[in-house]
């Protein structure tokens, strides 16, 4: 009888101790999360990356050494790209020369020469710029090139970096984004697929989303009119953007599908470092007959054409290796051939002598 009692007591004690330990770790985890708020879960690696990015910014602008950042502003550092880190220029974007000229006047000059735009209210820089048009036409590349050419820091907004599980913290992160942009000016705040973030408001919106949009508009209106901080949005669904936000994007540029001349320029840029067959390559033929292709489509077409030549090289080299003609490490006996028109027309399922637009693609 006493033996049974002892076993029961031991079992109860074991369960009690196990429960106590579990509760201890659970409460400790919850307390740490509450204390950390939106910064919870930030690893040492993330914090080290933030510190490294800040050092780059200070090295580029020594005056920032006197600037202090709060915890929320530091979380935005990982989203910042300096002009030195951007490898895209207007020379890398083909077929958009008239648009680039307009963007110089609307974006680059206000960022580089704010004194010109502060002399008169009529010359104030636009509060925002919207790039809209079909996908794959270079809107994001244009935004990066604008930051590169103007020497502005580039903050790319991602919803994952704004939204937080703690109530009210998302608003603080948005506030930190604007305050950090003011400290790092000249600065471009870029919102890709802006329609997904600033879409038309309705009574069915969640409270958190509604307050976040209201906070964003308030901070947007609070930007100084010296043009040193500018918001650029990109979308292929302009009709989904709320009218209140469209009003704050007075400069709107359509980035449409390229015409024949534009496609020629885009292809020239894409193939400038690629060997082309002098006798069997007709760039104008390809440009004239790729109607409806976006810049992204043309890039993929060029990639597929180059891949065909690479596959031929691999096949020939394997045959020579198998026959014992060359060694596997031999790189001088065989070269990748230049690209030909047929490499492109093959991908469009056409005969090289036919016009591409007159034939079915299936």
Curated annotation (Swiss-Prot):
It holds the Pfam family AAA. It catalyses: [protein]-with a C-terminal TM segment(out) + ATP + H2O = [protein]-with a C-terminal TM segment(in) + ADP + phosphate + H(+). ATP binds at residues 133-140. Residues 29-362 are cytoplasmic. Changing residue 81 to A: Impaired ability to extract tail-anchored proteins from membranes. Does not affect formation of a homohexamer. SMART domains: AAA (SM00382). PROSITE patterns: AAA (PS00674). Homohexamer; in presence of ATP. Interacts with PEX3; leading to inhibit the translocase activity. This is Outer mitochondrial transmembrane helix translocase. The gene is MSP1.
